[in-house]
């Protein structure tokens, strides 16, 4: 049994950091409790150790701390989350404490929030379909169990509504398997938190969800712990309770801002745009916790959501996220301004594992061919629209005009399904065929004749 060590040797507080001197046998990442002169308890984590000095990262901020009268206790273990199957259906704050007025959780065990490194050899390949009910994702950018597929949004775009829609609608097609959603919110406003909770409550989706809410007025440093706490809960449900867990994390930009704040307080040499040079490594410790394990029934799938500062996809946060994850869903200001919801720009969006989750036995045999044909037709239609702007519509051929018609209907009916319409994969595929029937059969060169004969609707000439 570890001995709790208590000190009164705090020498300095700088922003969210505290320096404690004359420490002995203290470990990196060790949990710290600071008892203030008025009895208030605040928590922190050992960030760095040098000789007999420890740098502590404070989760609840440093205001009101009297260095001479504060007692610092090192717990002998890292920050841990109390986990239980009863977490499902509950709402917690960013540090894992219940805030829904329900009873205290009776933990089955305590787990280190940093998780365990997954041996690459023990990973199982993602190859099963997750249905979000959103055509632009299910058909064109298929989400697969165990994948990490981020959403790149911009200022003013409805990524919160998209996140809530996915949390409400996402499911696995085999009804015999348990499915849960873990939702981690970082730096959101009170109104946004109420929106998420109300959306899940009124549809009953709260009963299969675990929510962790870090609000904008909560300490920024808490945001560093929130996604790790959420992923710890997800790993417990997936690998110990055999559930398929979808983790939605929003907004990762706020998480990275908190990292930058700590880095600045430590006076580290800044990297690109002032973010720490280890931003890539730090993000990978979150994103790489998605996946499946050999011999385990459950899976952890991630949808991290981030807002691109100034809509710049080359900004360090989306840039590094794109390197680590397996694709991206990109939201478009142009589609949003035209009234399309959700405004997913399907052409630059990508799911690198989409071919692993589609096909006979997973979705339908015509999934991949129709996906390729829709991409090709939509890209051609956008080119024709640009040509019409330059040369005028009179310069378009009859086939070009059909492509323009296809593009308009594709955006109005396929992309613009709304935030409250849940389309199953059958309905999505059938809608794709209906739109492709606008074009002459000779233009559908990416689909084999047997599939055209089977699915292409008869069109009156």
Curated annotation (Swiss-Prot):
Q: Does the keyword Transport apply?
A: yes
Q: What is this protein called?
A: V-type ATP synthase beta chain
Could you tell me the superkingdom of the organism this chain comes from?
Answer: Bacteria
Q: Which UniProt keywords apply?
A: ATP synthesis, Hydrogen ion transport, Ion transport, Transport
Lineage at the top is: Bacteria, Bacillati, Bacillota, Bacilli, Lactobacillales
- HAMAP family, A to Z: ATP_synth_B_arch
Question: What protein family does this chain belong to?
Answer: Belongs to the ATPase alpha/beta chains family.
CDD domains in the cross-refs: ATP-synt_V_A-type_beta_C, ATP-synt_V_A-type_beta_N, V_A-ATPase_B
Report the InterPro entries cross-referenced here. Answer: ATP-synt_VA_C, ATPase_a/bsu_AS, ATPase_F1/V1/A1_a/bsu_N, ATPase_F1/V1/A1_a/bsu_nucl-bd, P-loop_NTPase, V-ATPase_su_B/beta
Q: Name one Pfam family in it.
A: ATP-synt_ab_N
GO MF terms held by the record: ATP binding; proton-transporting ATP synthase activity, rotational mechanism
Q: GO biological process: what's one of them? A: proton motive force-driven plasma membrane ATP synthesis
């Amino acid at each position: 049994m570890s001995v709790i060590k208590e000190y009164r040797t705090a020498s300095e507080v700088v922003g969210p950091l505290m320096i404690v001197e004359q420490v002995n046998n203290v470990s990196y990442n060790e949990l710290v409790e600071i008892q203030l002169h008025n009895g208030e308890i605040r928590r922190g984590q050992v960030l760095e150790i040098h000789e007999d000095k420890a740098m502590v990262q404070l989760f609840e901020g440093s205001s009101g701390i009297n260095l001479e009268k504060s007692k610092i206790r090192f717990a002998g273990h890292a920050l841990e989350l109390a986990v239980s199957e009863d977490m499902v259906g509950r709402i917690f704050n960013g540090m894992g404490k219940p805030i829904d007025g329900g009873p205290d959780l009776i933990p089955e065990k305590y787990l280190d929030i940093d998780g365990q490194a997954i041996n690459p050899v023990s990973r199982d390949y993602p190859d099963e379909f997750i249905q979000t009910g959103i055509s632009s994702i299910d058909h064109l950018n298929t989400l697969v169990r165990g994948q990490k597929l981020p959403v790149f949004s911009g200022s003013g775009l409805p990524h919160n509504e998209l996140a809530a829609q996915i949390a409400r609608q996402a499911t696995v097609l085999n009804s015999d398997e348990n499915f849960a959603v873990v939702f981690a919110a970082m730096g959101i406003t009170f109104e946004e938190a109420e929106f998420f909770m109300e959306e899940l409550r009124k549809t009953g989706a709260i009963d299969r969800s675990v929510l962790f809410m870090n609000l904008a007025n909560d300490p920024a440093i808490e945001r560093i712990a929130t996604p790790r706490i959420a992923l710890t809960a997800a790993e417990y449900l997936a690998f110990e309770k055999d559930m398929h867990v979808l983790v939605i994390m929003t907004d990762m930009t706020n998480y990275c801002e908190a990292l930058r704040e700590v880095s600045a307080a430590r006076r580290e040499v800044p990297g690109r745009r002032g973010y720490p040079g280890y931003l890539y490594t730090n993000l990978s410790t979150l994103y790489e916790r998605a996946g499946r394990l050999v011999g385990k029934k459950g899976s952890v799938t991630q949808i991290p959501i981030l807002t691109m500062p100034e809509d710049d996809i080359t900004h360090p946060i989306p840039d590094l996220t794109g390197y680590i994850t397996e694709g991206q869903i990109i939201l478009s200001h142009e589609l949003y301004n035209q009234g399309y919801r959700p405004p997913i720009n399907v052409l630059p969006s990508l799911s690198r594992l989409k071919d692993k989750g589609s096909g006979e036995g997973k979705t339908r045999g015509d999934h991949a061919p129709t996906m390729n044909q829709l991409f090709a037709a939509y890209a051609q239609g956008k080119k024709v629209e640009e040509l019409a702007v330059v040369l005028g519509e009179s310069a378009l051929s009859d086939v070009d005009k059909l492509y323009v018609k296809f593009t308009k209907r594709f955006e109005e009916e396929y992309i613009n399904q709304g935030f409250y319409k849940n389309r199953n994969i059958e309905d999505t595929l059938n809608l794709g065929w209906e739109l492709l029937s606008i074009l002459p059969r000779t233009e559908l060169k990416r689909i084999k004749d047997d599939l055209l004969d089977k699915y292409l609707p008869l069109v009156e000439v």
